[in-house]
């Protein structure tokens, strides 16, 4: 993810050796992940990633971060593993003062201590926090939810509904610079594993229309974590484990062709009937 409008610093999750945690993840068998960042130099080359030099990273697993539009507030996921307790995910927030990120605070989103909340992202207007949860009341599996942000903290929680959520898993919500919602799903028809979709509001019905991003964005592997370069609705990065026999995730770049003109009309056959 990018912080604010700076296109030359990219934040991402990694289990590389510099990550703090020493325990192995019970699902992946790899060490716990931390949040890293990489800077792009004047030659547009990405430099060696470094872990955040702050209290954001811990012995537990951190990842799936996102930022406010001014780049001064970061939301992220922390997965804690404690003795004699199930592993679960929580959302934390950290404020930046100068170049340093402050001590993170847990977001009081749910009173339910048995449900996980993860993958936070702010709406373009900053008035809602979108996230993923397995809390009761959804469509099944992991669903996309949102909670409104008020002056006093968090307000009510909404499920995004059956047009977006399925009985399988939906996760990794994000927004493009033009406000389009993107997410990954194993429930909508796709190419295999997690596929990336975008949700467009139908101007006539007000309902969501879900579109699969197709190849080459999606593959038979897991494709997720779409992020857009600030001010560029047609390029950015996403993650995928395609082509890796070990199932490890890698970061890929993308760039969509720019649409300069849209031509609409009707096509008739030789009898004058609309095709």
PLM segments and residue spans:
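Short, conserved micro-motifs composed of acidic
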Residues: 1-266, 270-273
């Amino acid at each position: 993810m990018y912080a604010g409008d700076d296109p030359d610093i990219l934040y991402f999750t990694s289990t590389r050796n510099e990550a703090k945690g020493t325990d192995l993840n019970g699902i992946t068998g790899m060490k716990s992940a931390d949040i890293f960042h990489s800077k792009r130099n004047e030659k547009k080359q990405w430099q060696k990633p470094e872990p955040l030099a702050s209290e954001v990273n811990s012995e537990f697993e951190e990842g799936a971060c996102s930022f406010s539009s001014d780049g001064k507030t970061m939301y992220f996921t922390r997965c804690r593993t404690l003795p004699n307790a199930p592993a679960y995910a929580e959302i934390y927030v950290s404020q930046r003062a100068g170049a340093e990120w402050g001590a993170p605070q847990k977001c009081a989103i749910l009173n339910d201590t048995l449900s996980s909340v993860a993958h936070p992202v702010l709406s373009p207007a900053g008035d809602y926090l979108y996230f993923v949860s397995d809390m009761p009341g959804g469509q099944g599996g992991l669903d996309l939810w949102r909670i409104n942000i008020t002056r006093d903290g968090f307000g009510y929680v909404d499920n995004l509904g059956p047009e977006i959520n399925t009985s399988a898993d939906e996760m990794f919500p994000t927004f493009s610079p033009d406000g389009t919602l993107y997410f990954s799903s194993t429930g909508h028809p796709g190419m295999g594993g997690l596929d990336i979709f975008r949700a467009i509001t139908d101007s006539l019905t007000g309902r969501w229309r879900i579109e699969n991003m197709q190849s080459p964005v999606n593959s038979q592997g897991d494709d997720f974590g779409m992020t857009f370069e600030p001010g560029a609705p047609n390029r950015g990065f996403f993650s995928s484990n395609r082509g890796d026999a070990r199932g490890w995730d890698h970061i890929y770049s993308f760039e969509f062709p720019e649409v300069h003109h849209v031509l609409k009309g009707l096509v008739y056959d030789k009898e004058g009937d609309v095709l």
